[in-house]
């Protein structure tokens, strides 16, 4: 018998003799050759092979052979007959997929091995460790290896033992693999920047470096599932227990257990050992309370009779009615705002709510009919957020409704009492989860590919200590049945210090494991980035699609029936309902609430916060965005970094939550408000204030108003539509800024908590302001209104207990915060200091949100007259301060003011002490006028560039209370802080702004800007300086991409193409795109950055970027600097610009069609004027209606590569259909009629703001279309075509000239009659605006 090496060698020799290579054979021939080689030395008897069943090798580990110049000698050995049969059966059982992979390895022999005479094919079937330095060590033949793989044992025990260190054999039963240490062969990553471009690219191409992911955090080994089993370990039920509650749920009256409240928390099983277990407490026999105000003149018996009749009609069989005295002070019309006699109806919660249809005979108003049982329970039991409860009469629940480890029944709410103690809260278990889902093969549904869970035990919800990761779990499934996962995945990941990896054959198995794991871990808090709106929605959709039995383990309610959905997706309410019992920390929502950024993606946030996960770098995989393919999941080496990055994102989500301290902060906010902690985590700010006031008024025996129903038809709209919702009353005062560059010190003074302070200052409250339903503007309450009638009759002092409730609540918050800040000054321990900081921040956020309940239309405590009074007093306070400042010192002046702050130009250049003393003087004079309102120094600016309202940049003096030598730049409202400007635009603006603010004088600022921008423009056009990433623009999706209609949404067009490529696109995502060259609309020129990288024919539209991304922000930064002329900047950048009037600059803050039209290019005016109507005329020859567009006509002529540029006079206005000339007089007449029609429509519309904008945009569009020769930096070829080559024969003196006459009279400039017409109408729109500020000026 010959071995495989000799066969391969002879065959290669025969091919060399024929002058051809072995690898020139076809795939079929190579396949046949491999089969023949595998069958060498085996018997030809097919009967023996047919006696036994075929053995199918499902999957084998194939590793790339190590490059070596030495030949491995293969020993000859006689094979037994049974091994021959095994070899034959293996050959027949090889699948097409396995054989193709074998062929691929067959072809990929290194160049060094091709030159060798003897090549061993067994290298493709064994581990790298078979190589030895001298090449003479023991080896294993291919037949022995394949036979051992089938039988599960070694073919030669002695040989296997000798090769134990270098040649690990894989047993398919136990799947035990070993690997050599790769630390010694770690490659140094290359980080080069290529200066050469690919063909057609006009940007620097960066070589993408994929760094190896290494775990830098020790991850604990995963414990067995039995240790997490959720079994009830109680042998008996204690008479009472200490229970820490943090979430609750009301059972509606339509379910099997109506009128029940479920409390979720942790029960203390052993007070000595402080052992806590998750627990659900079901409170039975909860009652509803309804208050009914009898009409004047009705008797108690009549009221009771009418109430009983309504209850009998509604099926309320059990009820109690009694008459009580209660106060009322809110907006229900016809209800007196004093103490009154009310009828109180009490009945069990298992009955439906009391009907409140109005039109009752003896009852004037019904309050509390729509109030939920849970709200009533929290208010009546005075549960102020998560806390300990002492519960009596516990009964172990036999019919469990939750996934908690323990579950009890409580007969009555009276068995629950608040446990007043300073006992610290129990430790919590936190699970941070991260999914990777991508569209299926049809591009319709999101399917889960992998999921990771990072578990944190013993977490302090007060933020006393930072926890470490306890366990980690990661599950991954194969993409399709024909793409199995590598068998050694778990062992390989474990060798990379990543435990807890599990493989699954399909999505159903993966999700079943995920649901069971959550049930076993039983976390109290679930953390995730965009978990509400994406993760939970994806899980619920896939759970329902695949009918996962334990789908409800995402929460703690054991629900078997899936919720009903409308359409294809769950709404947010259903998602939150599914998570009841577990607190959900969505770092995306909370970061938007408590962290200011332009990009709220997880990886971007972690970079901004300088947060690290468990790896030393980020890798190339991004969960939810990167599309996984089969090739990336075929080997453990490729799949392990993906799973590691998935787990790393789960860890990063928890680290972001820890960085923001959202768990202790939201807990403290809940303790102040007395609402549900879960609702605070979802960002229900108005609800927090409502509960705070509900507790305050209920404790004083007030009847509180019901919730208002919101307009459910109002959906999610674009950001532009938000501005259409106008406030019903005037807000704060914003002074007109005195724009310019200031080099003297600027003093910034600010009222501390203006609106809460005004409420205290003027006793603004529901109980003190007289008003009715017709009151629009309320007045400051007089002193006699600060005491109620009953307290006045009792001789009590003013203000009484039942008045000024809102100011008292705010004063309590302010005083508490002041006390905590005093404690922080003396606190030395960092842990205690951090906890105090969280407490004071919670008090500040709550106090500042109190005003919102007055002006929010859908708040149950909405009172427009009170909100209007507060803002009016705020405007008066600011105005009085502005008037007082010049009286203190004539040399100072107010340059800007906004709601609660003023900026003062001090006139001082180099003495910070004088500036500080001036601020203290102004502060003292203003504060003498008020008791609760306080003006303070908010900051000092060393230099300031003030552009317009809410737009400025300044150098803030950090140590203004000291020497004043430390500066920090502060930017507000400028283009450079917005994400819809590319990084290059932001960097250029940053450099210009840095030079402006740091300049001693304005002499060389403009020279620097002109020179710098000229160099930038040259670098951009050269394409050899800036990489592609500098041109990426990012914009957020406010709705589904399919919901965008019309033009002007390039990010939506790019998002649609991303969805076609099965990339994950969700509402709220930032869509990156690049504008490339082309004559299409901007929507059609936008491409994803990956599309540009992959394409050789796409190039960045540098002219568009220069005119639309670089010029506008720099021009706006410099326009108020003395001596700046926009034309100088446009000439330096070699772009075309259009002169802007002073009125254009003033109206730039308002979004309209004219706001971005100061820059004109010689093409694509439709991009600048998307709403303008084009000029269309009927051809006098072919009778078709054709557009008139000289821009497009000339640019098409010069951009055409098929035709040479025109060299002889040609007609400019020709029909696009027949190509014949159109008469100039006829065109001018058509344009005049069109303009008259537009003006007539404008007057018919009433001349509103929208009509004015549309009219200006239309006439500016027409003027720009025919004004190309007048535009600066118009290309010489285009300008020559317009003015010389084309037949424009109307002179400036309104006389007709021929081209020859023009040459003889050079002073006579040819003028287009259409341009003259456009200019005449353009001047007429000036009469639409009257400057009233100079109307009464005297000369």
Swiss-Prot record:
Q: What is its main location?
A: nucleus
One Pfam family here: DNA_pol_B_exo1
Phosphoprotein is among the record's keywords: no
GO terms (molecular function) for this protein are: chromatin binding; DNA replication origin binding; DNA-directed DNA polymerase activity; nucleotide binding; single-stranded DNA binding; zinc ion binding
Q: Which SMART domains match?
A: POLBc (SM00486)
Q: Which residues bind Zn(2+) 1?
A: 1179, 1182, 1215, 1218
Please tell me which top-level EC class this enzyme sits in. transferase
Q: Where in the cell is it found?
A: Nucleus
User: What positions carry the motif CysB motif?
Assistant: 1244-1274
Under the heading InterPro entries, the entry gives: DNA-dir_DNA_pol_B (IPR006172), DNA-dir_DNA_pol_B_CS (IPR017964), DNA-dir_DNA_pol_B_exonuc (IPR006133), DNA-dir_DNA_pol_B_multi_dom (IPR006134), DNA/RNA_pol_sf (IPR043502), DNA_pol_B_thumb (IPR042087), DNA_pol_palm_dom_sf (IPR023211), POLBc_alpha (IPR045846)
Q: Which SUPFAM superfamilies match?
A: DNA/RNA polymerases, Ribonuclease H-like
Q: Which UniProt key words apply to this protein?
A: DNA replication, DNA-binding, DNA-directed DNA polymerase, Metal-binding, Nucleotidyltransferase, Nucleus, Transferase, Zinc, Zinc-finger
Example GO CC term: the record gives: alpha DNA polymerase:primase complex
**In which family does this protein belong, per the annotation?**
Belongs to the DNA polymerase type-B family.
Biological role: Polymerase alpha in a complex with DNA primase is a replicative polymerase.
This chain belongs to the protein called DNA polymerase alpha catalytic subunit
Specify the species. Trypanosoma brucei brucei
């Amino acid at each position: 018998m010959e071995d495989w090496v000799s066969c391969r060698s002879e065959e290669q020799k025969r091919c060399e003799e024929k002058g051809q290579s072995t690898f020139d054979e076809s795939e079929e021939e190579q396949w046949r050759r491999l089969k023949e080689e595998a069958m060498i030395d085996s018997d030809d008897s097919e009967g023996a092979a047919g006696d036994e069943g075929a053995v199918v090798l499902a999957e084998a580990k194939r590793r790339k052979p190590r490059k070596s110049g030495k030949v491995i000698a293969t020993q000859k050995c006689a094979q037994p007959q049974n091994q021959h049969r095994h070899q034959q059966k293996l050959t027949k059982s090889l699948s097409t997929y396995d054989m193709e992979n074998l062929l691929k390895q067959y072809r990929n022999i290194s160049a060094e091995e091709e030159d060798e005479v003897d090549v061993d094919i067994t290298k493709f079937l064994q581990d790298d460790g078979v190589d030895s330095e001298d090449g003479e060590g023991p080896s294993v033949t291919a037949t022995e290896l394949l036979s051992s793989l089938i039988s599960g044992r070694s073919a030669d025990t002695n040989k296997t033992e000798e090769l134990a260190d270098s040649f690990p054999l894989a047993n398919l039963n136990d799947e035990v693999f070993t690997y050599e240490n790769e630390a010694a062969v770690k490659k140094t990553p290359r980080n080069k920047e290529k200066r050469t471009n690919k063909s057609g690219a006009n940007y620097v191409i960066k070589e993408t470096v994929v760094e190896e992911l290494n775990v830098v955090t020790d991850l604990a080994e995963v414990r067995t599932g039995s240790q997490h089993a959720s079994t009830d370990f109680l042998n008996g039920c204690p008479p009472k227990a200490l229970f820490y509650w943090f979430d609750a749920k009301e059972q509606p009256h339509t379910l099997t257990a109506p009128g029940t409240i479920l409390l979720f928390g942790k029960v203390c099983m052993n007070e000595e050992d402080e052992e806590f277990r998750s627990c659900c407490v079901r409170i039975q026999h909860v009652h509803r309370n309804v208050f009914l105000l009898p009409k004047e003149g009705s008797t108690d018996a009549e009221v009771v009779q009418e109430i009983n009749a309504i209850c009998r009609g509604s099926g309320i069989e059990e009820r109690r009615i009694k008459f009580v005295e209660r106060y009322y002070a809110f907006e229900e019309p016809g209800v007196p705002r004093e103490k009154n006699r009310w009828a109180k109806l009490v009945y069990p919660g298992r009955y439906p709510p009391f009907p409140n249809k109005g039109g009752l005979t003896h009852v004037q108003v019904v309050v509390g009919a729509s109030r939920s049982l849970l709200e009533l329970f929290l208010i009546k039991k005075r549960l102020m957020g998560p806390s300990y409860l002492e519960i009596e009469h516990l009964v172990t629940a036999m019919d469990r409704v939750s996934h908690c480890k323990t579950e009890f029944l409580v007969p009555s709410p009276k068995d629950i009492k608040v446990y007043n103690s300073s006992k610290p809260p129990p430790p919590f278990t936190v699970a941070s989860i991260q999914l990777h889902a991508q569209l299926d093969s049809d591009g319709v549904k999101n399917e889960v590919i992998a999921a990771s869970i990072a578990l944190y035990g013993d977490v302090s919800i007060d933020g006393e200590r930072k926890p470490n990761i306890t366990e980690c779990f990661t599950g991954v499934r194969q993409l399709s049945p024909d793409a199995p996962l590598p068998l050694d995945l778990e062992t390989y990941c474990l060798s990379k210090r990543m435990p807890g990896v599990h493989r699954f054959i399909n999505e159903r198995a993966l999700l079943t494991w995920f649901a069971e794991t959550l049930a076993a871990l039983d976390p109290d808090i679930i953390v995730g980035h965009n978990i509400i709106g994406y993760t939970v929605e994806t899980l619920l959709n896939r759970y329902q699609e695949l009918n996962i039995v334990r789908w409800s383990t995402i929460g703690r309610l054991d629900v078997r029936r899936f919720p009903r959905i409308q359409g294809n997706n769950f709404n947010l309410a259903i998602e939150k309902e599914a998570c009841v019992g577990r607190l959900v920390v969505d770092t995306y929502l909370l970061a938007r609430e408590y962290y200011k950024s332009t990009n709220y993606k997880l990886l971007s946030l972690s970079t901004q916060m300088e947060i690290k996960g468990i790896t030393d770098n980020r890798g190339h995989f991004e969960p939810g965005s990167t599309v996984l393919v089969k090739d990336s999941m075929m080997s453990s080496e490729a799949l392990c970094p993906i799973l590691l990055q998935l787990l790393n994102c789960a860890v990063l989500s928890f680290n972001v939550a820890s960085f923001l301290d959202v768990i202790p902060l939201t807990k403290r906010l809940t303790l102040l408000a007395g609402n549900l902690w879960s609702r605070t985590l979802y960002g229900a700010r108005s609800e927090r204030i409502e509960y705070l006031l509900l507790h305050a008024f209920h404790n004083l025996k007030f009847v509180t108003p019901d919730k208002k129903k919101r307009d459910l038809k109002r959906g999610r709209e674009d950001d532009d539509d938000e501005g259409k919702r106008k406030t019903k009353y005037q807000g704060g005062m914003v002074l007109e800024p005195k724009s310019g560059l200031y080099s003297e010190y600027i003093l910034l003074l600010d009222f501390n908590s203006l609106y809460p302070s005004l409420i205290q200052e003027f006793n603004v409250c529901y109980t003190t302001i007289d008003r009715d339903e017709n009151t629009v503007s309320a007045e400051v309450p007089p002193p006699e209104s600060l005491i109620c009638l009953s307290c006045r009759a009792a001789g009590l002092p003013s203000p009484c207990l039942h008045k000024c409730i809102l100011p008292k609540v705010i004063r309590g918050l302010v005083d508490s915060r002041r006390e905590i800040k005093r404690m922080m000054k003396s606190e030395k321990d960092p842990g205690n200091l951090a906890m105090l900081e969280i407490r004071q921040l919670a008090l500040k956020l709550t106090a500042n949100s109190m005003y919102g309940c007055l002006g929010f239309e859908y708040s149950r405590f909405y009172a427009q007259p009170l909100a209007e009074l507060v803002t009016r007093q705020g405007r008066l306070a600011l105005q009085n301060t502005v008037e007082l400042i010049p009286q203190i010192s004539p040399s100072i002046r107010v340059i800007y003011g906004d709601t609660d702050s003023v900026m003062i130009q001090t006139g001082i250049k180099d003495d910070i002490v004088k500036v500080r003393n001036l601020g203290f003087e102004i502060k003292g004079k203003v504060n003498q006028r008020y008791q609760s309102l306080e003006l303070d120094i908010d900051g000092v600016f060393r230099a300031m560039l003030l552009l317009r309202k809410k737009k400025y940049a300044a150098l803030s003096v950090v140590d203004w209370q000291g020497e004043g030598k430390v500066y920090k730049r502060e930017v507000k409202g400028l283009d450079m802080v917005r994400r819809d400007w590319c990084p290059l635009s932001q960097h250029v603006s940053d450099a210009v702004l840095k030079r402006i603010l740091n300049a001693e004088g304005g002499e060389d600022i403009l020279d620097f800007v002109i020179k710098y921008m000229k160099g930038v423009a040259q670098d951009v056009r050269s394409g050899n300086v800036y990489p592609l990433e500098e041109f990426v623009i990012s914009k957020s999706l406010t709705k589904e991409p399919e919901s965008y209609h019309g033009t002007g949404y390039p990010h939506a067009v790019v998002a649609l193409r991303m969805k076609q490529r099965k990339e994950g696109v969700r509402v709220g995502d930032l869509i990156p795109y690049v504008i490339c060259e082309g004559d299409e609309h901007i929507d059609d020129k936008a491409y994803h950055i990956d599309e540009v990288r992959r394409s050789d024919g796409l190039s960045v539209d540098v002219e568009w970027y220069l005119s639309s991304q670089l010029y506008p922000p720099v021009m706006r930064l410099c326009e108020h600097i003395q001596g700046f002329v926009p034309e100088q900047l446009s000439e330096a950048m070699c772009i075309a610009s259009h002169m802007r009037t002073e009125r254009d600059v003033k109206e730039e803050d308002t979004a309209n069609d004219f706001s971005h039209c100061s820059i004109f290019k010689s093409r694509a005016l439709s991009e600048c004027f998307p709403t303008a109507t084009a000029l269309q005329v009927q051809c006098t020859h072919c009778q078709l209606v054709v557009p008139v567009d000289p821009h497009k006509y000339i640019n098409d002529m010069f951009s055409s590569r098929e035709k040479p540029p025109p060299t002889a006079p040609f007609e400019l206005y020709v029909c696009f259909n027949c190509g014949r000339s159109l008469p100039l007089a006829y065109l001018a007449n058509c344009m005049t009629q069109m303009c008259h029609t537009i003006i007539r429509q404008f007057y018919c519309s009433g001349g509103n703001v929208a009509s004015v904008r549309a009219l200006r945009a239309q006439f500016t569009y027409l003027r720009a279309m025919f004004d190309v020769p007048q535009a600066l930096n118009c290309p010489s070829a285009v300008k020559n075509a317009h003015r010389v080559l084309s037949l424009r024969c109307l002179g400036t003196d309104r006389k007709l000239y021929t081209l020859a006459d023009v040459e003889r009279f050079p002073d006579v400039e040819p003028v287009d009659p259409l341009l003259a017409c456009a200019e005449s109408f353009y001047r007429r729109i000036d009469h639409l605006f009257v400057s009233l500020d100079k109307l009464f000026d005297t000369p």
